Regions:
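Acidic, polar ligand-binding/catalytic clefts
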Residues: 1-45
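A ligand-binding cleft/hinge motif common to bilobed small-molecule-binding domains
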Residues: 1-10, 92-112
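Periplasmic-binding protein-like
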Residues: 20-26, 107-143, 165-189, 197-200
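Bilobed "Venus flytrap"/periplasmic-binding protein-like clamshell domains
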Residues: 27-67, 79, 96
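Soluble non-cytosolic domains of exported or imported proteins
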Residues: 50-57, 73-77, 92, 132-140, ...
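Ligand-binding clefts/hinges and TM-proximal coupling segments of bilobed small-molecule sensing domains
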Residues: 54-66, 146-203
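Hydrophobic residues within well-ordered alpha-helices
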Residues: 63, 83-84, 129, 142
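Short helix-initiation/N-cap motifs at beta->coil->alpha
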Residues: 71-85
Length: 203
C-alpha cells in the first residue's frame, strides 16, 4: 500500500493495480455482536466501537486519524482470534480478502464470524508496482506496458476476470458507505483520473 514514506524511498508506477479496492472494507464481526451494529449508519456511531488492525498497517493510522478506537497485534494470525475472543468488536477487511479469510478461520470460529450486512468503510488507497530509484528504466517499461493494457482493454478484462465476483458478492449497492480520509496519501496520487479507480458507478 502506498504511503508518503514509501514514495520517498522508492519509485512508484502510479497505476493502482487493484483500482483502490483495498480501501473498500467490509466489517467482519461475531454473530453475538452483530445486532449492536444494526442502528449504526454514520462515522459518529463508531466512536465506541473497537477496531482490530495490524500494529504497523497503514490502515491503522487511517482509523486513528478518523477518531476511531483501534486495538492491534503484530501477528496477523492472532487478529481473528482477538475478534473471536472479544478483544475487539470489528475487523475491517478488503472486499477482495474477506471471503477467503472467513473460510480460513471458520474452523477456529465455527459459524461465529460474519459480515455486517448494511455497512462498509471506504478510504482512498493504492497498491502500485514499486521500483528502486536506481532503475528508472524498469519503472518506465512497466508504466508503458500498463498504459498499453489500459488502452486496449486488457487491464480491465483481467481485473474483471479476477475480481468482479468479489465485487458483486460484497453487495455494495445495498450498503451505507462510511468514507474516511487518508491523510498519508501522497499528493501525487492520481485521484482525479477516475478511470484508474473502482467506484459504485462500476456496479
Amino acid at each position: 500500500m502506498t504511503s508518503q514514506q514509501r514514495e520517498k524511498e522508492l519509485l512508484p508506477v502510479r497505476v493502482p493495480i487493484f483500482k483502490g479496492l483495498y480501501g473498500w472494507r467490509l466489517l467482519v464481526t461475531t454473530q453475538n455482536k452483530l445486532n449492536s451494529f444494526s442502528s449504526m449508519n454514520s462515522l459518529s456511531d463508531f466512536k465506541q466501537v473497537h477496531f482490530i488492525q495490524g500494529h504497523d498497517w497503514p490502515d491503522t493510522q487511517i482509523l486513528l486519524d478518523s477518531g476511531l478506537p483501534v486495538v492491534t497485534s503484530i501477528e496477523y494470525s492472532s487478529l481473528f482470534n482477538m475478534l473471536i475472543k472479544g478483544r475487539g468488536d470489528v475487523f475491517p477487511r478488503s472486499l477482495l480478502e474477506v471471503e477467503m479469510e472467513l473460510n480460513t478461520f471458520k474452523d477456529d470460529a465455527g459459524e461465529n464470524l460474519t459480515v455486517v450486512p448494511h455497512l462498509m468503510l471506504q478510504y482512498p488507497t493504492a497498491i502500485y508496482f514499486f521500483f528502486s530509484k536506481d532503475n528508472p528504466e524498469i519503472a518506465q517499461a512497466v508504466e508503458k506496458g500498463l498504459a498499453i493494457m489500459r488502452n486496449n482493454g486488457e487491464f480491465d478484462r483481467l481485473f474483471n476476470a479476477y475480481y468482479r465476483s468479489a465485487i458483486e458478492h460484497a453487495d455494495i449497492k445495498n450498503k451505507i458507505i462510511i468514507r474516511l480520509e487518508n491523510k498519508n496519501l501522497p499528493l501525487l496520487t492520481p485521484l482525479d483520473n477516475t478511470s484508474l479507480w473502482f467506484s459504485e458507478k462500476d456496479m
